[in-house]
Amino acid sequence: MALDSAFERAPCQSAVVYGLMPSENENNTPYLLRLAQQGAALAQVLLLDEAHAWTDLPSRTAQTGWLNLVQDVPHWLSLDELQGGQNLRSQSQMSLPICRENGAVLGVLQLEYAGKNGFDEAAQIVWLGLALALAAPLQALLQPEKAEEAQDE
């Protein structure tokens, strides 16, 4: 419901909540799994490795724990700060980490907008608020033992 509400207040082309999952593959690479979405569908699974950090903004955000705001995707592509033709599906992207209180990344909120400069200050506030609000439920979903420890403190 919170994703629906934020999407109504700050509409965009795509809004996706990814959960950070432990590695379940032979090369021990953790990945992001799409848990919820509004608007156009984005990738179901994104690996967290060096190659994907350049091609998928949510992977970069999950690896660094930093918010990434790209108001002009073609410009970032021309600078090689972002790579891959799939990024041309939008002109603006914002990728926000969803973190525990200690800064550990639980997931990523990925947003895409059809036009350049798609995320004004009001939209950034709405989406940042959602990223903060998602921390507790995402921790309970993905790390239930740590959520119980936090409640006991």
What are these regions (language model features)?
Residues G19-Q83:
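Regulatory sensory and allosteric helical modules in signal-transduction proteins
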Residues S14, Q93, V108:
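Broad gene-expression machinery/nucleic-acid interaction feature
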